C-alpha cells in the first residue's frame, strides 16, 4: 500500500512522453511532500501516483532529492506567480494570500518538521520563485534608512502571522470566539492588522 492514499495515477491514465512524465512526477511529488514530508515520501509511491515506472525518477531527476527539489520549486513558482498577479504586480502579496496555496504551505511545513530546511532554502534563495525574498528585498529598497535588524524583525513577525493563520485558522476562530456569520468580517480585520505591520493596503 502507498504511504498516502490518493488517486493513482493522478491523470487517470499513464503519463507518456518526456514532458508529461516529468510533469506527472513533479505534481505527484508536490502533493506527497505536503501529505507526508520528505522523509516518509517514497519514490515508488510518487511514481505509482504519477502513473510511471519508478525508474523514471532517476532518469529525469537523478534520484529522490532531485525530484523533491523540482517539486518544491514548482510549488513555490506557482505561489510566486499567482501572488504577484493577485497583488497587481506589487512585491508584497495581499494579506493571507497564502491561504490560496495550502499545498505549498503544507509542503514547507512538512520539510521544517522533518528538519529539512535545506529543501525549503533551495527555493528561498531564488529571486525568481521566493515570495519571502521578494518581500524582504522590497522592504529594504523602500526603507533604505531603516535599521536592517529592525526591518528583518518586522518582516519575520509579519511572516509568522501569515504562517500561523494558515496553520491554525480554525483554532484561532474558536479562541477569538468568532460567531457563525462573523468569519468573513473577522478575516478582513485580520488582514487589516497584518497590512498595518508592513504598511500595505488591503482590498
Give residue ranges: language-model regions:
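C-terminal peripheral helix-coil segments that are non-catalytic and often amphipathic
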Residues: 1-8, 130-145, 167-203
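Basic, helix-initiating cap at the start of DNA-binding domains
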Residues: 1-36, 40-49, 62-69
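Amphipathic alpha-helical interaction segments
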Residues: 24, 107, 153-160
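Short hydrophobic/aromatic patch on the recognition helix
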Residues: 51-61
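Alpha-helical DNA-contacting segments of helix-turn-helix folds
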Residues: 68-75, 83
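Amphipathic alpha-helical packing segments from all-alpha helical-bundle domains
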Residues: 77-84, 117-144, 149-153
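Hydrophobic alpha-helical connector segments
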Residues: 77-113, 155
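Amphipathic alpha-helical segments used for helix-helix packing
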Residues: 98-137, 169-172
Amino acid at each position: 500500500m502507498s504511504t498516502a492514499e490518493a488517486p493513482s495515477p493522478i491523470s487517470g491514465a499513464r503519463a507518456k512522453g518526456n514532458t508529461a512524465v516529468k510533469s506527472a512526477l513533479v505534481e505527484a511529488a508536490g502533493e506527497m511532500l505536503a501529505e507526508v514530508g520528505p522523509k516518509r515520501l517514497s519514490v515508488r509511491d510518487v511514481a505509482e501516483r504519477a502513473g510511471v515506472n519508478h525508474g523514471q525518477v532517476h532518469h529525469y531527476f537523478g534520484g529522490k532529492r532531485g525530484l523533491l527539489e523540482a517539486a518544491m520549486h514548482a510549488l513555490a513558482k506557482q505561489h510566486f506567480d499567482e501572488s504577484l498577479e493577485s497583488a497587481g504586480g506589487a512585491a508584497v502579496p495581499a494579506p493571507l494570500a497564502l491561504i490560496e496555496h495550502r499545498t505549498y504551505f503544507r509542503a514547507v511545513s512538512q520539510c521544517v518538521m522533518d528538519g529539512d530546511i535545506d529543501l525549503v532554502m533551495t527555493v528561498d534563495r531564488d529571486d525568481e520563485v521566493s515570495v519571502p525574498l521578494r518581500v524582504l528585498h522590497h522592504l529594504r529598497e523602500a526603507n533604505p534608512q531603516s535599521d536592517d535588524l529592525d526591518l528583518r524583525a518586522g518582516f519575520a513577525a509579519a511572516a509568522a502571522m501569515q504562517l500561523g493563520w494558515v496553520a491554525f485558522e480554525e483554532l484561532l476562530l474558536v479562541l477569538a470566539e468568532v460567531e457563525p456569520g462573523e468569519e468573513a468580517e473577522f478575516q478582513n480585520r485580520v488582514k487589516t492588522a497584518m497590512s498595518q505591520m508592513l504598511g500595505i493596503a488591503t482590498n
